From Swiss-Prot:
Gene3D superfamilies: Spore Coat Polysaccharide Biosynthesis Protein SpsA, Chain A (3.90.550.10). It comes from Shewanella sp. (strain MR-4). The lineage of its organism: Bacteria, Pseudomonadati, Pseudomonadota, Gammaproteobacteria, Alteromonadales. Belongs to the MobA family. It comes from the Bacteria. GTP binds at L10, A11, G12, K23, N51, D69, D99. The keyword Cytoplasm applies. This is Molybdenum cofactor guanylyltransferase. Its EC number is 2.7.7.77. Transfers a GMP moiety from GTP to Mo-molybdopterin (Mo-MPT) cofactor (Moco or molybdenum cofactor) to form Mo-molybdopterin guanine dinucleotide (Mo-MGD) cofactor.
Amino acid sequence: MSLQIDAVILAGGMARRMGGDDKGLVELNGKAMIEHTIERIKPQVKEILINANRNQTRYAEFGFTVLSDEHTGFLGPLAGMITAMGHTQADYLLVVPCDCPLLPRDLVARLLAAIKANDAELAVASDGEREQPVVMLLKPSLRESMTAFLEAGERKIDFWYAKHRFAVAAFADQPNAFVNVNTPEQKQRLAAEINQS
């Protein structure tokens, strides 16, 4: 029996460092940032969900289910993850941010391999130096634990997953895979990299 793996693209943040622009909709090389992300992960998963707290109609134009946080008040990535975990029947949920256009094309395979090798509940990606807390594969059954953590006033994803059996999948061979866009300057640099990839 093959596993079902769905994905959620997190596009629910305030993007303060981008002057408040909705990062997923910022154009990069003629496409919305989220389109680059969709292209990278679509072959790796069954269903894609988009977590967005504004411009929902615009996000719906990409052809996927759009979910807004069940917990109101822009509470960060955990709120979007909790919402998505409540809307999937999959065995695993892939979590990625909307502003990482160079995500690995073998992201799911390597995260899943790390889970199996370590008998873990979730796997987090690493660029070889640092863990990437918003790039992970996890069991949706962890929703209750994550909800309790958020409702206790906690926000840091790495503090949450440290409480669970987690594995790290290293992508040191793809050092730019998790480069994201927080400033207009980073956007310019990334545009040049995409042209070369």
